[in-house]
């Protein structure tokens, strides 16, 4: 009888051990995501930040600015996220100051239209969207907000360092959407 219990115990242990999920020999396929940049610039900050979140993820970067609209429409359907990047000034006509372009720097109307399309898609589809610098300003304008056309007239030119180099600067959030 003891031999039978021992044999049964060994049998149960073997059965339970074989039921475990031991797939160490199976390699997982790396996950991939598609991120659309409103306009890729010479800075690698966006890529560096996202790629360091999880280096095992393969990221398919799409530069919306240079992608034909017909192809961009297809790419947007598969996009996992959108980043509205930094860049030139937003046309003041979009926030009610159409005649205030003299105080602005370079304006890119094509980009304003493109980022409107990207935000339309993000809101309709629920695709996550991150705005960085100009991108965040554009999100504000898109949602009905306004801007100061030329910050040095109001504050100081604190967002630029020597020779036009970008610098880190503080931001203050006073109200969130939906708050």
Language model: regions and residue ranges:
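Cytosolic ligand/metal-binding cores
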Residues: 137
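Conserved G/P- and acidic residue-centered "switch" motifs that form tight phosphate/ATP-binding loops
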Residues: 133
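N-terminal beta1-alpha1 cap of cysteine-dependent amidohydrolase-like domains
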Residues: 2-3, 18-130, 140-148, 152-179
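Bacterial N-terminal signal peptides
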Residues: 7-15
């Amino acid at each position: 009888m003891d031999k039978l219990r021992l044999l049964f115990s060994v049998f149960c242990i073997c059965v339970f051990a074989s039921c475990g999920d031991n797939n160490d020999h199976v390699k997982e396929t790396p996950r991939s995501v598609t991120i659309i940049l409103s306009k890729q610039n010479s800075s690698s900050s966006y890529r560096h930040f996202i790629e360091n979140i999880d280096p095992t993820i393969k990221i398919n970067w799409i530069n919306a600015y240079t992608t034909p609209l017909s192809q961009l429409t297809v790419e947007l359907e598969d996009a996992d996220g959108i980043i509205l990047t930094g860049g030139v000034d937003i046309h003041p006509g979009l926030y009610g100051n159409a005649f205030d372009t003299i105080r602005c720097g370079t304006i890119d109307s094509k980009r304003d239209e493109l980022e409107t399309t990207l935000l339309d898609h993000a809101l309709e589809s629920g695709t996550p969207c991150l705005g960085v610098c100009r991108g965040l300003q554009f999100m504000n304008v898109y949602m009905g907000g306004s801007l100061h056309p030329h910050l040095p007239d109001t504050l100081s030119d604190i967002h630029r360092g020597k020779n036009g180099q970008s610098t880190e600067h503080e931001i203050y959030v006073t109200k969130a959407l939906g708050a």
